[in-house]
Amino acid sequence: MTQMTPREIVHALDQYIIGQQEAKRSVAIALRNRWRRMQLDDSLRGEVVPKNILMIGPTGVGKTEIARRLAKLAGAPFIKVEATKFTEVGYVGRDVESIIRDLVEMAMKMVREQAKEEVAHKAEDATEERILDALLPRPRGSEYDHARDESSTRQTFRKKLREGQLDDKEIDIEITPQGGGFDISAPPGMEEMTSQLQSMFSNMGKQKSETRRVTVEEARRLLHDEEAAKLVNEEQIKHRAIEAVEQNGIVFLDEIDKVAKRGDSGSGGDVSREGVQRDLLPLIEGSTVSTKHGMVKTDHILFIASGAFHLSKPSDLIPELQGRLPIRVELQALTPDDFKRILTEPSAALTKQYQALLATDGLEVNFTDEGIARIAEIAWQVNDGTENIGARRLHTVMERLLEEPSFQGGDMASPLTIDAAYVDEQLGELATDEDLSRYIL
């Protein structure tokens, strides 16, 4: 997992997310504490439990984006799930234990890729020999069947192969198809059974190989994957994946407010919502979940929950669940200045995205500071006057603003300058007419 310090993690998040320093600091400290815990003695390590986080804030201010970026930084098994997908055991829908099963599958994939990288050099050597065997078939029954013939011809072909001179040449290779090709659909809540059936069917046809005629370049890719798969130890991968989940796993629970009881309502839906919360309790507190790869203890998995809490409050969650989310972080609503920074500062800001997209048609687009300030002001006004959807409003505003250039592309006069006057010409009437902006922006 990552060895970045909290300061470095916050700096990395700053490249994509504007503001929300308190939330960034909390997740950075939580992530660093995962690494710190792994440096402790075994006797103390088992006693240090993660401090789970509850992020509270309106929609579109960066809660989910923090999770997405954190997943890339973590270098640990990470899964993001929506709490609304799960139901109480006995109802139609997924049960909460499938979160851990999915997390284990993510870890298996991650550890397998790492294991393949570790044996990449050996796999490359074996791949090269198999391609040379296809290019220079050996005589049957010769004394070289079990020993490599390092003749001058083979060395010449090896040199050409490494230099890429034979990439376009077609050869016949024998490969074993990965998986059995079965795709089984199942109703919600039965994913585990489906997975086991697929595994069973794919194992039945595992040993059958087929001959394919492909180019050397494609053969190198296909054979490398097959040779790497032969070299890795599946049992060791399972053991490492389960250990990674138990010690470093992170679960991001989005939309947690949607399973909270809403005010004083006593509707039937609240029964199922409260059931989901009660099912989450043992996972967050620490329990053992059965997966097809083995038993997984959840005692040291970090849970980060988030929700907008428009129609409910954090106190509407059941008290036991509140107690298991001890760190509370409130994300702030975005200001006009935040909108302006969102349009310019991130490495993949919206303005840069549109400039790159339209440049493919030969249309150069330039944004002035006044134009960006006006776009930010309009987005904030519409949020303030209608429904506050945070930074997502910028997508709607920008799409409307650049609708004509996007349609005409290279037919428009280049360069196109987006200044305050152009923004007012395209969006001014919509921004001032609240009824119109309610439907269009």
From Swiss-Prot:
Annotated ATP binding lies at I18, G60, V61, G62, K63, T64, E65, D254, E320, R392
Location within or outside the cell:
Cytoplasm
Region annotation (Disordered) maps to 131-158
Q: Which domain of life is it from?
A: Bacteria
Electron transport among keywords: no
Q: Name one GO molecular function term.
A: peptidase activity
Give residue spans, biased composition: Basic and acidic residues: 140-152
Known function = ATPase subunit of a proteasome-like degradation complex; this subunit has chaperone activity. The binding of ATP and its subsequent hydrolysis by HslU are essential for unfolding of protein substrates subsequently hydrolyzed by HslV. HslU recognizes the N-terminal part of its protein substrates and unfolds these before they are guided to HslV for hydrolysis.
| Family the entry assigns | Belongs to the ClpX chaperone family. HslU subfamily.
Name of the protein: ATP-dependent protease ATPase subunit HslU
Q: Which gene encodes it?
A: hslU
